[in-house]
């Protein structure tokens, strides 16, 4: 019923004429209601009053669960309040159900939380920060909650996309990625300066991390323009070549901007010369593709 309230809110909120409100909800794979949660967006079967067809949903999966699936073990569903095991089910059966629903409906998202936290920036590990969940489309993995200074953080997405359909036109441009990273740095600074006080936690998080997400759009259009099948070896070669180029340029831009404008506070505290804690995010691009 609480999820249904959020479901109704997304229908009531819109961003002008661009797109209506949207939200994603995440629960851990050991939550007692995980089986019903998996079917949240399936339009048929179950109580229609407990469906939420306008929300996106994701499952937070620790390594422990995947080990249980691998070994065909029982999996304990725990109370969120005191972590007491309420009942046990087959991990493998639950995994099959998750995969089947994802194949049929496209969701839920899977967030491999232990892997995510192993891959966060080193200065965030040193600060004891932790990623607890993801965002609307599961491409953002930023820390939330109370940090070492006792401040509450709310993650902020500051995104932009390179158009790969025109990759051949800009691939040799020496500063295109750096220019976009400068643009994103200016955008996040504008948010920090102008956002209302009601967004204080988000402003604080953006100020400390300066995390941005440079992504891409038009990858399939690029392959079509080159007459390359999506699942071919050549598509994989282009994929690695393009993203290697973008990543290296984004990393270099972060260092350059740190020297010019100073490192972000999270990195600077540990002597790391990085303007951005996070630099890339491959987000869905439905709205900007039209």
Question: Can you name each region flagged by the protein language model?
Answer:
Residues 23-26, 66, 74-76, 108-110, ...:
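Structural motif
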Residues 18, 179-203, 207, 211, ...:
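Internal maturation/activation junctions in enzymes
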Residues 7, 11, 36, 160-161, ...:
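Contiguous, well-ordered alpha-helical segments that form the cores/surfaces of helical PPI scaffolds
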Residues 13-14, 24, 97-100, 146-148, ...:
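Generic recognition of flexible, low-complexity loop/linker segments
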Residues 29-31, 161-163, 284:
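Short, structured patches in soluble enzyme cores that scaffold and shape functional sites
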Residues 134, 287-290:
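Gly/Pro-rich active-site capping loops and adjacent beta-alpha segments
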């Amino acid at each position: 019923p609480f999820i249904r309230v959020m479901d109704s809110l997304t229908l009531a909120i819109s961003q002008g004429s661009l797109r209506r409100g949207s939200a994603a909800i995440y629960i851990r794979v050991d939550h007692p209601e995980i089986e019903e949660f998996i079917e949240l967006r399936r339009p048929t079967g179950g109580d229609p009053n407990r469906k939420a067809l306008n929300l996106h949903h994701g499952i937070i999966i620790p390594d422990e669960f995947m080990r249980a699936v691998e070994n065909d073990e029982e999996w304990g569903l725990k109370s969120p309040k005191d972590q007491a095991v309420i009942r046990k089910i087959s991990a493998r059966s639950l995994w099959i159900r998750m995969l089947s629903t994802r194949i049929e409906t496209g969701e839920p998202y899977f967030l491999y939380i232990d892997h995510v936290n192993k891959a966060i920036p080193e200065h965030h590990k040193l600060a004891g920060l932790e990623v607890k969940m993801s965002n609307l489309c599961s491409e953002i993995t930023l820390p939330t909650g109370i940090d070492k200074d006792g401040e509450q953080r709310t993650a902020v997405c500051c995104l932009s996309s390179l158009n790969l359909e025109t990759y051949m036109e800009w691939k040799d441009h020496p500063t295109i990625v750096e220019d976009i990273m400068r643009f994103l740095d200016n955008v996040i600074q504008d948010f920090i300066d102008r956002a209302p006080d009601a967004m204080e936690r988000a402003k604080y998080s953006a100020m400390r991390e300066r995390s941005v997400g440079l992504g891409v759009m038009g990858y399939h259009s690029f392959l079509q323009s080159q007459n390359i099948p999506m699942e071919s070896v050549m598509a994989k070669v282009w994929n690695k070549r393009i993203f290697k180029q973008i990543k290296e340029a984004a990393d270099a831009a972060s260092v350059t901007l740190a020297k010019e404008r100073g490192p972000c506070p999270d990195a600077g505290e540990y002597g790391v010369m990085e303007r951005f804690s996070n630099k890339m995010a491959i987000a869905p691009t439905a709205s900007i593709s039209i």
